[in-house]
Amino acid sequence: MISTTTHSVEGHEITDYVGIVNGEAIMGANVVRDFLAGISDVIGGRSAAYEDKLAEGRQIAVREMEDRAAQLGADAVVGVMLDFETLRDGMLMCVATGTAVKLRRRS
């Protein structure tokens, strides 16, 4: 499955717009990691724990979005956007949204 933030796929023509698809991931962060991330932020370093959580959430959300597109018979998802939100109690939500399309290779 091709996923792209652009509105076209190089070397292909979009033959059908199947619909809007999305995927979500809600991740928990533990208290020790939150505390250590806070120390890292105060010192001015990067928080690897949060970066890892963001990457994991992104992968899950994109995979779920692609699975939904495949269920609709799509070849690709274009115009992909990612959104991250911090929820209460240390929860992190990642949402991937895009348009599922059918493609034909240009000759």
From Swiss-Prot:
**One Pfam family, short name please?**
YbjQ_1
Which InterPro entries does the entry link to? Answer: UPF0145_dom_sf (IPR035439), UPF0145_YbjQ-like (IPR002765)
The superkingdom of the source organism is Bacteria
Matching PANTHER family, A to Z? UPF0145 PROTEIN YBJQ
Family stated for the protein in its record: Belongs to the UPF0145 family.
What is the protein named? UPF0145 protein BH1111
Q: Which organism is it from?
A: Halalkalibacterium halodurans (strain ATCC BAA-125 / DSM 18197 / FERM 7344 / JCM 9153 / C-125)
